[in-house]
């Protein structure tokens, strides 16, 4: 069913609001994907707080107009699904991970930090660990010397007690 003018304006406004908050936009061609698989992709995107939408390309072009993602308009051809996220790598990670298990989802392009990326760029962005993973690694590295020092003190205390006994 075609959208009337008010519906189109509402869609553009909704997508524009998401794009205004976004750090990353990923475009992927979804031709031939079963509805069940697309539903799984949407569920994964929701878990990662990625806005995922199948959208007419003309409406998407209007939504990115005047934003850092405007250069992506040249890539907006064919049946595309748009992944938009506030997290720098979440959209790329969700789409890339799903495309590994479903060869009918083909990453077409993406944009991060005002730069348009090709498929290889999106895959490289997806390979970066998430913020939480990086913070946990940093915390582990910071804790290692402290816990080692604590174990050394405990061993020294045990040794002194053994000598005293």
From Swiss-Prot:
InterPro entries in the cross-refs: Ribosomal_uL10, Ribosomal_uL10-like_sf, Ribosomal_uL10_bac, Ribosomal_uL10_bac_type
GO terms of biological process kind: translation
One Pfam family linked to the record: Ribosomal_L10
CDD domains: Ribosomal_L10
Domain of life: Bacteria
Keywords: Ribonucleoprotein, Ribosomal protein, RNA-binding, rRNA-binding
Tagged with keyword RNA-binding: yes
GO molecular function: large ribosomal subunit rRNA binding
Assigned GO CC terms: ribonucleoprotein complex; ribosome
HAMAP family documented for this protein: Ribosomal_uL10
Oligomeric form and interacting partners: Part of the ribosomal stalk of the 50S ribosomal subunit. The N-terminus interacts with L11 and the large rRNA to form the base of the stalk. The C-terminus forms an elongated spine to which L12 dimers bind in a sequential fashion forming a multimeric L10(L12)X complex.
Function of the molecule: Forms part of the ribosomal stalk, playing a central role in the interaction of the ribosome with GTP-bound translation factors.
Family designation: Belongs to the universal ribosomal protein uL10 family.
Name this polypeptide is given: Large ribosomal subunit protein uL10
Lineage summary: Bacteria, Pseudomonadati, Pseudomonadota, Betaproteobacteria, Burkholderiales
């Amino acid at each position: 069913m075609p959208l009337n003018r008010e519906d189109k304006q509402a869609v553009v406004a909704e997508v524009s609001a998401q794009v205004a908050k976004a750090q990353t936009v990923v475009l992927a061609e979804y031709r031939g994907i079963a509805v069940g698989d697309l539903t799984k992709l949407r569920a994964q995107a929701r878990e990662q707080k990625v806005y995922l939408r199948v959208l007419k390309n003309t409406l998407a072009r209007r939504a990115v107009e005047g934003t850092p993602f405007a250069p992506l308009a040249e890539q907006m051809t064919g049946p595309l699904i748009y992944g938009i996220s506030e997290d720098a790598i979440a959209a790329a990670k969700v789409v890339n991970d799903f495309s590994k298990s479903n060869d009918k989802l083909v990453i077409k392009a993406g944009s991060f930090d005002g730069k348009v990326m090709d498929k290889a760029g999106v895959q490289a962005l997806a390979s970066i660990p998430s913020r939480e993973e990086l913070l946990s690694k940093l915390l582990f590295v910071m804790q290692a010397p402290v816990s080692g020092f604590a174990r050394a003190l405990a061993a020294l205390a045990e040794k002194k007690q053994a000598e005293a006994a």
